[in-house]
Amino acid sequence: MEKTVKKVKRIEGSLRVPSDKSISHRAIILSSLADGTSIVKNFLKAGDTLTTVNAYRKLGVEIVEKEGVYYVHGKGLDGLKEPDDLLDMGNSGTTTRLTLGVLAGFDFFAALTGDDSLRKRPMKRVAEPLSKMGAKIDGRKDGNLLPISIRGGKLTGIDFFNEKMSAQVKSAILLAGLFAKGDTTVIEPVISRDHTENMLNSMGAYVSREFTKDGYRVTVKKADKLNPIHINVPADPSSAAFFAAAASIISGSHIELKDVLINPTRDGFFRKLKEMGAKVEYKNKRDEAGEIVADIYISYHELKGVKVEPQEVPSMIDEIPLLAIIATQAEGETVITGAHELRVKESDRIKSVIENFKRLGLEAEELPDGMIIRGKQKVKGGIVDSYKDHRIAMGFAILGLVSEEGITIKDADCVYISYPEFFNHLEKVSK
């Protein structure tokens, strides 16, 4: 599907964007391992997260939806069953990597595959540490690419340095650690999103966390059981970011974004937006299952270019393409470095942004690990390629709002991966 987004006068209104994708995934996965029934409200019902639901049903977990609430009848830490068919991971890297961590603890055979995009994404980053712990893993390109087979069993804890600061890698190892003899420790130079630690802690698992001279250090021990949870999944900051960005680049705009997760490992984009000059306020802060939630108010103010340093990247990794896009409207230059992880997302997001900038006649320089974007550029409009990547599609839709002739996005239906109602919501707040 192609979608054209045209210039608007302003952005105005109040939205509750879809629930957080990361927490929705983890709520299903961890609840599947709990003793008893977990209740998950405000679950994100989108392509990636429904992949997780389907995968754990194939592993023998009863997951029932009633009036938008998901009831997960956990099987305990020894209750998953060998699947009788391939587990299809769709487009979801999170489902794949975290599930490999879970399956490492079970002495049965499973094979995972995915769509064209997912079959190109690197899996050795989790396969290697899980193999060191004792799992038997094989796949294409020496275990780096799907399809991948795994047979888990007796695991031993390891100390792992998470150089890439990937929350998916960390989570896979910590989940395997629930089944492993001894301590399992992950060290990161800069803390990546910590929802797995928060949720495990709330379910009664042993989770030790500290900041040392080497960085962030988290340890789990073998668990006897996980307690079921009742959780209201907060709104996704990565989805909220698109509307915050729109309000910050269109004069006279202001928007309220309700119930947004503002975990410090996830709200880097909003902090950077404030640094650029936008008016950003957190109101009505509250706690939800160990996570901080707030209503966010954003108003237009002229933006200035900024530097995004490598240590800032993990807290805004999914929003960096969007930041690059709105940087074209800021005063001065924006420099982004240390974002090499963008190369192995649903698309090569650095290349995707740069190529689309070229199509629109916008000036930017591609770096191996980031971008340099010239500010205050007029956007005439044109046709861009989403590369079937939901965040690229939504990011360039936001740029369409300030374009002279509109921006047409190819394969725009990929937004279903995380935000099925995106274009409807965009229309709702466009004036």
Curated annotation (Swiss-Prot):
MF term (GO), any: 3-phosphoshikimate 1-carboxyvinyltransferase activity
Keywords of the record: Amino-acid biosynthesis, Aromatic amino acid biosynthesis, Cytoplasm, Transferase
Active site positions: 318 (proton acceptor)
Localization (cell): Cytoplasm
Gene3D superfamilies named in the record: Enolpyruvate transferase domain (3.65.10.10)
GO BP: amino acid biosynthetic process; aromatic amino acid family biosynthetic process; chorismate biosynthetic process
SUPFAM superfamilies: EPT/RTPC-like
Major place of residence: cytoplasm
Record InterPro entries: Enolpyruvate_Tfrase_dom, Enolpyruvate_Tfrase_sf, EPSP_synthase, EPSP_synthase_CS, RNA3'P_cycl/enolpyr_Trfase_a/b
Binding positions (phosphoenolpyruvate): 21, 93, 121, 168, 349, 391
Catalytic activity reported: 3-phosphoshikimate + phosphoenolpyruvate = 5-O-(1-carboxyvinyl)-3-phosphoshikimate + phosphate
EC number annotated for this UniProt entry: 2.5.1.19
GO cellular component, one term: cytoplasm
Metabolic or biological pathway: Metabolic intermediate biosynthesis; chorismate biosynthesis; chorismate from D-erythrose 4-phosphate and phosphoenolpyruvate: step 6/7
Annotated positions binding 3-phosphoshikimate: 21-22, 26, 166, 168, 318, 345
Function: Catalyzes the transfer of the enolpyruvyl moiety of phosphoenolpyruvate (PEP) to the 5-hydroxyl of shikimate-3-phosphate (S3P) to produce enolpyruvyl shikimate-3-phosphate and inorganic phosphate.
Subunit description: Monomer.
Family per record: Belongs to the EPSP synthase family.
The protein, known as: 3-phosphoshikimate 1-carboxyvinyltransferase
Lineage start: Bacteria, Pseudomonadati, Aquificota, Aquificia, Aquificales
Gene: aroA
